[in-house]
Amino acid sequence: RFNKGEQIDILFISHFHEDHISGIPKLMKHCRIKRVVIPYIPKGDRVLFAYSNRDLAGYEELITNTENYFRNEAEIIRILPEEESEDNNNETRDEELTMPSGRSITATYIGVPIADWCFIPFNYNYAAKVKQLQVALKAEGLDHSKLDSVSYIKNNYDRIKNVYKNLSGNINDTSLVVFSGMHLNFIPYIFFSYQPGRYEMYKTGLNCIYYGDVNTDKDILYNRLMKRLQNLYATIQTIQIPHHGSKHNFRSTIINPGSISIVCTDSNHKKQYHPDPTVIVDIVNTGSFLHQVTDNVNSTLTEHGHY
């Protein structure tokens, strides 16, 4: 909950799905957003990405021209896919700031005076499916050179939609994952407060991980994440369960015993049976505390850290 006019130092957008971006316009009216982190999409692919899904109607500029969408008042950082990150440092591509996947963004970098706090975003090739779509559309006889034309995409939307449905995989599989926390040389304690019904608990460890809608059941993604975080993962005490608790995106080894597992759902996800009962059982069996955050403001979980 933010006060009117309050500054948000850094905003992470895990991926461009309506249920993950619909609150941004309201947030922009209510707060001042200083910095936004998004997955990198090549410029030539952004129009096809934005206009090949009608669920993104009204959010096209957020994808095609993010700087302009935020009225050029926020710094935009694009996280490169893993494949392009190995030999890259922070760089500017056509006046756009990019950063390698797995690179630490320190609190000092964003102007927040918290010692040793950092954010580590991961991008496992978020835009890969757009490339697959381009190849498949060309095979279907569509003009590849016009796939960056809004009118051409709209005129051929039904054909594009059918091809898109037949592609393997899911764009959720590669949404951003973000670690937020402190390095190993700090041992803080944490206090949780919940209203109404109020429960309080004290724990050591402030560190969090946000999985967005990513598929943690994919071995390559999971193994790369664990290799990067190594011993840091054991310090994580707050875990956002991927894809609203879907059993297709979950593996029980992402849960640390004694942690808080947060499942974010709204009324739409009840139709999809999220969270899945098997996910709930796995969370409880690991000794984690399950908390469900919904579109009801009273479900808010606030984390207060002291160190």
Annotate each language-model stretch with its function.
Residues R1-Q7, R71-T238, S246, H306-Y307:
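Core dinuclear metal-dependent hydrolase active-site scaffold
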Residues F2-I38, Q230-S246, S259:
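Active-site metal-binding motif and surrounding structural segment of the metallo-beta-lactamase
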Residues F16-I21, P42-D45, N215-D219, I241-F250, ...:
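Active-site environment of divalent metal-dependent phosphoester hydrolases
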Residues M28, Y202, R251-P257:
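Alpha-helix C-terminal capping segments
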Residues R35, K43-P113, Y222-M226, T253-Y307:
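Binuclear metal-ion centers of metallo-dependent hydrolases, dominated by the metallo-beta-lactamase
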Residues P39, Y211-G212, P242, C264:
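A cross-family glycoside hydrolase active-site/sugar-binding cleft signature
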